[in-house]
Structures are given as structure tokens and as C-alpha cells.
Amino acid sequence: ILKDYNSYSNENLLDFYLLTGGVAKYIELFILNNSFDLKSMIDTIIDPNSMFLEEGKNRLIEEFGKEYGTYFSILALISDSKTSKSEIESILERNISGHLARLENDYNIIKSIKPINAKPNSKVQKYEIVDNFLAFWFRFIFKYQSLIEAENFDRLKEIIYRDISTFKGKFLEKLFIELLKEKQTFTKIGSYWERNNQNEIDIVAIDDIDKKVLICEVKLSEKRLNYNDLLLKSQKFVQDYKTYEIEY
């Protein structure tokens, strides 16, 4: 689509993926508004007449029913990198086991993720919002609802531009994981971390047939890549793959 409209670049591709997740309705609205880069897409979303501003509420309030406030609070925290059950419960000061289970199994809005080599009964896990736009909506629109109500759209855009790089990083990881899966050369692809989010590795791809492991650090800027740091973080992980060829 971006190539069709002479707007293709790596950055525009990531932004388009971040804000649409491939959902046809969102893509059509951006095409209609000739919005193919981050600024024009944000201008389309953060507009007094934009359907995007109420999208999260319109999609979810009726589905969640009277407990929508709790569900929205959980999703807002997950979108803001509070991704473990213990983190969320400490902030909300209540048990949310049932809510997380329903969000994942009944509503299919979140999914739980475990480290790539975790045992089946491991309780080390995180949650992420499946829908790209909903993740953005909870992170920036729901969180700053007061600015929208005050019609302070310029201030909201400033906040989005200020914080979007950190938010983008997780979606760049997600995009690369999807691209690696499309290659169909690995038997397992995921992320790795140890307890308390220690030694977090963005992407690990394992080929159990040819005995190869690919360990990746994903950054928006090449200057932020640190090869030695990646070697240190992967020390414990690679102990389980001593007979494998390791590539960084």
C-alpha cells in the first residue's frame, strides 16, 4: 500500500504497522485521509471529528459490561509496559487473575507470553495487547482522556511525539518476529528474560533441526546496539544450547 502511494520507507512501514496492525478499516481511513507517515496519521487520529478517539470505548464497553472500568485500567497498564500480573495487582491493589483470564480466553484482547525456553508450568510470564491500535489507544488516548475532553489536541500530539519512540520499540520487535516466522526456518521464535525482567533479550529464534540459535537485540537506532551487553545477557540462556551454533 505504501509503495502504491509513493510513501514507502522503513520508518513509514513501522508506523503504519504500529497504528493499523493490518486492520482493513484503519487502513481505509488512513488512505481516505492520505495519511502514510507518522505525522499525518497522528493528525488523522487526534482530530475533533476522528472516529479513532472513541474507538476503544465503542469496541469494548458494551462487551465488558459494568466492569469495563477495571478492564480498561488493566489494559492501560499493559500498554504502558506494566506487563506482569504482580505489577498490575500492586498498582490496582486487587486480585485480577479472573480478569486476565477473561481478557485472554474470552475476549482475545491480550495474550500471555513466556520466555522462549520456559517450562510448561512456569509462572514467569508477561501480557501484551494483541491489537496494535488498541495498544496505542490505551497508551495515549485513554490515558490522556482529560486532554481530549479539554480539546487540548496540540498538547496530546506533543506527548505522543515525545513518547512514541519507546512505544515503537516493542512493535519493531513484534514486526521482526512476524517476519522471522514467515521465513519458516526456525522451530521456535520468541523473547527471553529471567525473573524480575533480568537479562531480557528481544528476539531468540531456535532451529532444533539444524541446531542453530539466532539471538537479536532490536533497536530503532543502530547507535543504541550493544553487542557486549547482548553477550552478557545471553550467558545463562546459551548454557542450554552448547551443541548449537549461536549467531548474534
Residue ranges and their predicted role:
Residues 21-25, 82, 106-107, 130:
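P-loop NTPase catalytic cores that bind/hydrolyze ATP
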Residues 2-3, 56-67, 87-90:
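Short amphipathic alpha-helical boundary/capping segments
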Residues 90-108:
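Short amphipathic alpha-helical interaction segments
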Residues 42-46, 60, 64, 112-141:
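Short, cationic-aromatic polyanion-contact patches
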Residues 5-61:
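Amphipathic alpha-helical "lid/sensor" segments that cap RecA-like P-loop NTPase cores
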Residues 78-91:
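Short acidic, hydrophobic short linear motifs in intrinsically disordered regions
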Residues 71-79, 177:
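Hydrophobic residues on short alpha-helical segments
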Residues 123-248:
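A cross-kingdom feature that marks ATP-driven nucleic-acid transaction machinery
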